[in-house]
């Protein structure tokens, strides 16, 4: 009877908790519209950045490509900072609302820069090859604007993913949300890469950046309007402290003999972690098991565990730390997967600038808009994968494709895209050498299609792996890790381009006198080596939280 009463009391308490009544599918429109607007904004100013720097600020081609890589690197690195702030201090909702406002300030400043002549260098004189360089003041204001839009974009993209997934309790509902999330992300990216970039190239930069600011403003208003429906997860302090504690405790007890008895280990976690602890630490990374091992110094006079949190951790805290360590090799493989793509994106813009971009006498493709091909085919194949390819594979083989298998397929398509790019560039250089008419920009399409298909396989799967396998208290960090990988890859691509430029003659300012095809073959070789490394890592990796039934395609998901 006592148990029954306590159970009824607990149910009554939960039903009276306002946070329990929030969340669910009512939040989906607010989340998706916010994401859609922010995607239009970030891709609108970001995809044409190289062209903007070259044409309006008179920065040299390779230097502009390098600046773009650095900007993209920061955009994708900073989400982990936003994740730390959300996980440890403020929660998702305040971080997202603040970030959208900061982004709005940045897009407004970009609009102002292109509206006032004295904030940009004077246009080049007709027929002159010498153009006025930007002043320090002009560059300074430009960098402030870029810093604001970078912070705003970084604080929303993957924090929105974690905030949206937090609105649902069941893993399958979270999976369905991620499908909608990536669909909205790609639709926004396509819109920004086509409509906004076309406006910048054919109307004015002022109008293009102004439209970015409008989309940003709509995102901010819609997100704030939905606050009363969101489920707010209160941060329980820094989850990173427990990770450091595991290292400290294991080091302090490094001479202790590891026990094989479960009663010798401290079993109790805190908060959400208390319900998921294991009775015995796993055998992998056994030296860390000492952090949860109880000895005389860890017991107080009453025989209970000591209150010294730096000497004794729970088994669950140890296992959480191990889970992160197991993911590090896979994380590195994803990083080296994204590096060739970052190189390719920069080189593709430079190639397009010296190719025939006219599709008709009255229509010319923007060099920055070519990335839309990646987004379109990524969007299409995300839908095909979830609604046709994955269910068909499951029906034929009898078991679903695991996330790591999906990532492996993405590796293959990425390598194929680099090889195609190398062949096309060799043909283009041959045409230039023979004095023929510039090749059509459509020759770049097949490689970009392969990149898009590859992203449809590996991008959502990587997010699913990190989100599913990371500890409960680090879910924001989990979703941001994919972005961090992309950010590091942009820095690595900048380093690769810099090394090639210093050691070879393949990348002059005029790529018609270079060998960009050789650059592509270098990244093809790197991609093949990385694929081999990934296959070894994935072969030995054992899923911690994700089970086979989590990968299975639900008919309801297909309809949705």
Curated annotation (Swiss-Prot):
Summary of the function given for this chain in its UniProt record:
Transporter involved in a passive nitrate efflux.
Annotated spans, Disordered: 1-20
Quick one: which gene encodes this?
NPF2.5
Which ranges does the record mark as transmembrane? 34-54, 77-97, 101-121, 141-161, 177-197, 207-227, 323-343, 372-392, 404-424, 441-461, 480-500, 520-540
Q: Tissue-wise, where is it found?
A: Expressed in the root epidermis or cortex.
* Main location group: membrane
Compartment(s): Membrane
Q: Which GO terms describe its biological process?
A: cellular response to salt; chloride transport; nitrate assimilation; oligopeptide transport
> What is the membrane topology noted in the UniProt record heading this document?
Multi-pass membrane protein
**Name by which UniProt lists this protein:** Protein NRT1/ PTR FAMILY 2.5
Q: Which InterPro entries match?
A: MFS_trans_sf, POT_fam, PTR2_symporter_CS
Q: Which domain of life is it from?
A: Eukaryota
Q: Report the source organism.
A: Arabidopsis thaliana
| Pfam families per UniProt | PTR2
Q: Which is one GO molecular function term here?
A: chloride transmembrane transporter activity
Name one cellular component (GO) term.
Answer: membrane
Alphabetical UniProt keywords: Membrane, Nitrate assimilation, Transmembrane, Transmembrane helix, Transport
The UniProt similarity line reads: Belongs to the major facilitator superfamily. Proton-dependent oligopeptide transporter (POT/PTR) (TC 2.A.17) family.
